[in-house]
Amino acid sequence: MKTQVQGSYGLRVKSPGGIIKREAECKNVITDLGMNRLGNTYWKAAEYIRVGTGTTAADPGDQQLVNQIAATNNRLGLATTDNSGAPLYRSRVTFTWQFALGAVVGNIAEIGVGWAGTGATLLTRSRILDISGLPTTISVLAGAILG
């Protein structure tokens, strides 16, 4: 049986009042560690979102962010859709996390999800990409919330 896993990130920078100031979306790389984790304890593979300033391309061999500056397990919601059925049997899971006000300030260049807030525990990693798919940063100013 052939099985595939893929994912993407959507980032929003919001004012404390909830006004969206910036959005970005990018596909991620499922790490080798992440694939092993999915095979053993998949329900605990995506507990934390982590952001950093690292600028190297994501690779399946990545185990942690290049230069992590913040992490949170403040999950606001979990939305799932049922299995799509034959012939593809697709399922979708959407997690929503939000950092506390002031927890992330600066230019974010990388993002990852893992089962812990630090260390070699990454399920996925990605660079932040612009609309053309090129590496960029997303600025989070003091007084803004990353979610």
Feature names for model-found ranges:
Residues 1-109, 115-147:
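Small cysteine-rich, disulfide-bonded extracellular modules of the LU/uPAR three-finger superfamily
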